């Protein structure tokens, strides 16, 4: 009998978690909360506007821990981090809400969004339409659909649910087969390429570069994971990839927003481009 991968363990626990959440708050109540939530802020548009100008469109992640690296940040105040990211030039935020493997929380998303004007993606493992409506109820502007965690029918159902409640969708792929499925099933403009293999948690930036030629020009590519230094950013920009999802490099920094500014907007000589100077 094979040993379950990290992703398989996460998905098994996620199914239990969704059942527990449904038992606590029924779908009708979550739908009521979703209808009364603040209007979406336009996650996809925020990224597309930057990328069209060939400026870094950074999704800055608020993540306390990960299964592979453990706790990334001891001093973890989501509102403070969100304001720091906004000042540093982020286009959007990503907030982990998975409790068991990433030490996330719904409250972190609420706190981060309330502290700034940036659109926010709920970073979690979506396997049930209930979670999509719940994402809108807690204030998310976008949800993540991970192709390796879903069959085509469920992926389409989740995307349709997202559209019905006004959420944008970032679809995430890791290889050619997943990309083919995503392009066939979904019409979202946002295609995330995760440089991390979710079964082994190994990272290679070549994943983005290898898949890039297969993606239609009308989709915006978001490179995810493994962007740690200026050379990594330049490697992507020379291939006309301008949208980035970055977490670890910022979470380990004393000032996450300052690290964002340094990594994406500061050229040699200290000149800052594209971000607010204050």
UniProtKB/Swiss-Prot annotation:
Family: Belongs to the TrpC family.
EC number: 4.1.1.48
Entry-linked Pfam families: IGPS
Coiled-coil ranges (or none): none
Annotated pathway: Amino-acid biosynthesis; L-tryptophan biosynthesis; L-tryptophan from chorismate: step 4/5
Keyword annotations: Amino-acid biosynthesis, Aromatic amino acid biosynthesis, Decarboxylase, Lyase, Tryptophan biosynthesis
Entry's transmembrane regions: none
PANTHER family, per the entry: INDOLE-3-GLYCEROL-PHOSPHATE SYNTHASE, TRYPTOPHAN BIOSYNTHESIS PROTEIN
Name of the featured protein: Indole-3-glycerol phosphate synthase
Gene: trpC
């Amino acid at each position: 009998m094979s040993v379950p991968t990290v992703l398989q363990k996460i998905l098994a626990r996620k199914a239990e978690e969704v059942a527990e959440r449904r038992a606590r708050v029924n779908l009708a109540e979550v739908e009521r909360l979703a209808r009364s939530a603040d209007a979406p802020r336009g996650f996809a548009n925020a990224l597309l506007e930057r990328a069209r100008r060939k400026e870094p469109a950074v999704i800055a992640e608020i993540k306390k821990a990960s299964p592979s690296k453990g706790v990334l940040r001891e001093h973890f105040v989501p509102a403070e981090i969100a304001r720091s990211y906004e000042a540093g030039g982020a286009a959007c935020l990503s907030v982990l809400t998975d409790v068991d493997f990433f030490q996330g929380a719904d409250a972190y998303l609420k706190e981060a969004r309330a502290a700034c004007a940036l659109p926010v993606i709920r970073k979690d493992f979506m396997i049930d339409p209930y979670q999509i409506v719940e994402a809108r109820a807690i204030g998310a502007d976008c949800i993540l659909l991970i192709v390796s965690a879903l069959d085509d029918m469920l992926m389409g159902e989740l995307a349709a649910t997202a559209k019905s409640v006004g959420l944008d969708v970032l679809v995430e792929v890791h290889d050619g087969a997943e990309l083919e499925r995503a392009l066939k099933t979904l019409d979202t403009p946002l295609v995330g390429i995760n440089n991390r293999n979710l079964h082994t948690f190994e990272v290679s930036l070549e994943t983005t570069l290898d898949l890039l030629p297969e993606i239609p020009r009308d989709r915006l590519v978001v490179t995810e994971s493994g962007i740690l230094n200026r050379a990594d950013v330049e490697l992507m920009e020379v291939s006309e990839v301008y949208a980035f999802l970055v977490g670890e490099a910022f979470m380990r920094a004393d000032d996450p927003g300052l690290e964002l500014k340094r990594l994406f907007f500061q050229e040699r000589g200290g000149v800052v481009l594209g971000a607010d100077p204050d």
